[in-house]
Design a protein with these regions (language model features):
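Short, solvent-exposed loop/turn segments that connect beta-strands within catalytic domains
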Residues: 105-110, 176-185
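Short, mixed charged/polar active-site loops
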Residues: 47-49, 183-186
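N-terminal positively charged amphipathic segments used for targeting/anchoring
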Residues: 1-16
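Conserved ATP-binding subdomain of kinase catalytic cores across diverse folds
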Residues: 15-126, 136-137, 154, 158-159, ...
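Activation segment of protein kinase catalytic domains, centered on the conserved DFG
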Residues: 132-144
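Hydrophobic residue at the +6 position relative to the catalytic HRD Asp in the kinase catalytic loop
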Residues: 166, 170-178
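C-lobe/activation-segment region of protein kinase-like
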Residues: 184-257
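C-terminal structural cap/anchor segments
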Residues: 142-147, 153, 164, 169
Length: 267
């Protein structure tokens, strides 16, 4: 199965007709996690930048090991392809699909790929906020970013989606930005481990929000900033949140502290 967007197909010297065409692409390697059976490349077509994620069979041994550890194995590009489409339906800014393909039905041996347009003139929130502790941004600018991240997270969780790697480095802010709400464009990336279902279990909401909290700890956020996030995420007054969500808040704190001790795993 091969799908190409018309724009991407028109830019190719010859259209891709099989998975081998994607695996033959040469480009700048961005990621190649050891033992993960996937790699990410950046390449250009007609002067436009694209990212290509290649997946190949992880083998039944690896699949069973993950399942026995109560972890869902990433066995192909289909998950990211579906996640990008779903986020688009929900109005959550993310990557733009250019191509997708899959070869074979056996999850232990199949090969697949997904191509997305490069998000040009963007910076990760991790880099954008790196000096906030020493050089705080304008109050309104910070509040808008916090509210946007909280609203995006709320929309995911209320629609049966959890990210599993929800760190501020996976939010890309379009540049330049003048601090206004109407010009704020924040894209969520790295969706290959996203889970899609009817309802997100509490433990996965805790993991997402705890991961966000951990990754923002060094940005100089104040107690009021955290309260702002909670108000938008829960869509409730603070009094109600503290009365009804105490267990959730303690679990989020525990998750964040655990990550602080051991660091972010390279999944």
């Amino acid at each position: 199965m091969i799908w190409l967007s018309k724009t991407f197909s028109d830019r190719l010297e010859r259209p891709w007709t099989k998975v081998d065409d994607a695996f033959a692409v040469e480009g700048e390697e961005y990621r190649n996690p050891e033992g993960a059976n996937r790699r990410t490349l950046r390449f250009e077509v007609d002067g436009k930048g694209y990212f290509l994620k290649l997946h190949w069979g992880v083998g039944w041994k690896e699949i069973l090991k993950n399942l026995l550890s109560l972890r869902l194995p990433v066995i192909g590009a289909a998950n990211e392809w579906r996640a990008i489409q779903r986020l688009g339906e929900l109005g959550v800014e993310t990557m733009r699909l250019a191509a997708y393909g899959k070869e074979g039905w056996n999850p232990a041996t199949q090969r697949s790929f997904v191509v997305t347009r490069e998000l040009e003139n963007s910076i990760s929130l991790e880099d954008y906020c790196a000096d906030w502790a020493g050089r705080p941004p304008a109050f309104a600018e910070k509040q808008r970013l916090i509210a946007r991240v909280a609203a995006m997270t709320r929309r995911l969780h209320r629609n049966g989606i959890n990210h599993r790697d929800l760190y501020i480095c996976h939010f890309l802010l379009r540049q330049p930005w003048d601090g206004a709400e109407e010009t704020l464009h924040l894209h969520l990336i790295d969706l290959h481990r996203v889970q899609l279902r009817r309802r997100v279990p509490r433990r996965w909401r805790v993991k997402d929000v705890g991961s966000l909290y951990f990754s923002a700890m060094e940005t100089g956020l104040t107690r009021r900033d955290l309260w702002r996030f909670l108000r938008v995420y829960h869509d409730q007054p603070l009094r109600s949140i503290f009365e009804q969500q105490g267990e959730f808040l303690r679990a989020v704190e525990k998750r964040a502290m655990a990550l602080k001790e051991k660091g972010i795993p390279d999944e």
